[in-house]
Amino acid sequence: MNSKKTEHTDIVAITSFYVTEPKLRRIEKSIYIDRIVHRWYVDNFMQEYFVKSFSYSSFACLKGKGMHNACLYVQEMMKHCKRIWNNYYIIKMDVAKYFQNIDKQILYEILCRKIKDKNLLWLTREILYSNGIDKGLPIGNYTSQCFANIYLNELDQYMKHKLKLKYTCRYMDDVVALVNTKKEAIEKLNLIRSFLKEKLCLELNRKTQIFQSTQGVNFCGYKINAYRLKIRDKGKRKLKKKVKFLEKQVKQGKMTCIEAHKYLSGHLGYINVANTKNLENKLFATEI
């Protein structure tokens, strides 16, 4: 690494604001020049050091993957498990307040395993502690997504190599694992809880459950079964609300039809991935 690029780089404090969708969250944002440094840091170094070693079952914030592919991957796993086991069990895990509870010292130690360049280590520490606290990553920073993925890659590797779980999928802090029996599901979940608490200082929240395969699983905004993938009712309600809001904006002259359609086009992929017949027609029945 060229030391000239980092020796005079000072990462300054970040600003914060709140968003209410999909729930109340504090978003912390670095100044423009720091955001340039963050992108350079992730794209030129973290990709090389860490992303190549990620499990194939990790889907968040990775090129060529994403939420929709994660859902399709879970569905393919379910089809396969139905063929080999017929009935099986689903462990659905969700980490409690994930970004807020990441232990920076543990994360830094994980990063140090692969990063040996002293200048890059210095910059890593500067970025990691830029908000002045020892626990939690700022939601909104480009580096936070990468750091968060690296942190739970520890869980991916534990499930794969220690627990010998073949059928898992993780989208950031949402995790699905498929196992043969209820007994195995309980045993594996208990081991995962212990690993998260002892090694990463994390806990699973109350959404974490064990289901029979016939119930399917809620994951990344979809209700997934082996041969059906539907948008959850909560997602449908949000889409309907957005469509009505845009109709009102257009009627009041606050937005053009072209602008409204451009906004809606971003949601069509979300709908088209699912096996939801006529939903698009119902949502967009009214001409905007």
Residue ranges and their predicted role:
Residues Y41, L189-I192, L196:
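PAPS/PAP-binding and catalytic site of the sulfotransferase fold
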Residues I11-Y18, K52-S58, N86-K92, W122-I127, ...:
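Short coil/turn segments at secondary-structure boundaries
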Residues M46-S53, M159, N275-N278:
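Short helix-capping/linker segments at secondary-structure and domain boundaries
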Residues S30, R35, R39, I186-E187, ...:
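Right-hand nucleic-acid polymerase module
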Residues N44, E48, E154, Y158, ...:
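Active-site catalytic microenvironments for nucleophilic, acid-base chemistry
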Residues Y18-T20, F50-F54, Y89, Y171, ...:
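Short acidic (Asp/Glu) and glycine-rich catalytic loops that position anionic groups and cofactors
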Residues S3-K4, L72-M172, V176-I192, K207, ...:
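Conserved polymerase palm-domain catalytic core
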Residues M1-L107, I115:
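Conserved two-metal-ion catalytic palm core of "right-hand" nucleic acid polymerases
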